[in-house]
């Protein structure tokens, strides 16, 4: 399986990288991004790893990664990442 990002997930990751670099410096932000990519690779290898959660319109999977949650669905042979949100954000309202 491969992982794919929605436009919202790309924007989320861009925000995470920019804020991380601003608050913690480039090297820490880059390590955090590498950890996030490693988790995405893990999810592509084991797409059922995260538990299913019921959102208002669909069932999604939620995998914590650092201070963030990766919200995704399994579609055919791909892991489609819907959003990457901070753990304190209300993910149900933001899907």
Predicted regions and their residues:
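Basic/aromatic recognition patch in beta-strand/loop cores that engages polyanionic ligands
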Residues: 48-77
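Short proline/glycine- and basic residue-enriched helix-capping loop/turn segments at helix->loop/beta transitions
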Residues: 41-45
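Enriched for short, Lys/Arg-rich terminal
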Residues: 68-95
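An alpha-helix initiation/capping motif
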Residues: 30-37, 62
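Arg/Lys-rich, positively charged N-terminal/basic patches that mediate binding to nucleic acids
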Residues: 1-33
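Alpha-helical linker/hinge and terminal dimerization helices associated
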Residues: 16, 36, 46-50
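GIY-YIG nuclease signature motif recognition
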Residues: 9, 36, 72
């Amino acid at each position: 399986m491969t992982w794919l990002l929605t436009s919202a997930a790309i924007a989320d990751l861009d925000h995470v990288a920019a804020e991380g670099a601003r608050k913690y410096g480039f090297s820490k932000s880059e390590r955090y991004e590498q950890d996030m990519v490693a988790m995405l690779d893990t999810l592509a290898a084991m797409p059922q790893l995260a538990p299913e959660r019921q959102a208002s319109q669909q069932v999604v999977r939620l995998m914590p990664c650092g201070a963030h949650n990766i919200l995704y669905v399994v579609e055919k042979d791909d892991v489609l990442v819907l959003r990457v949100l901070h753990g304190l954000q209300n993910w149900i309202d933001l899907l």
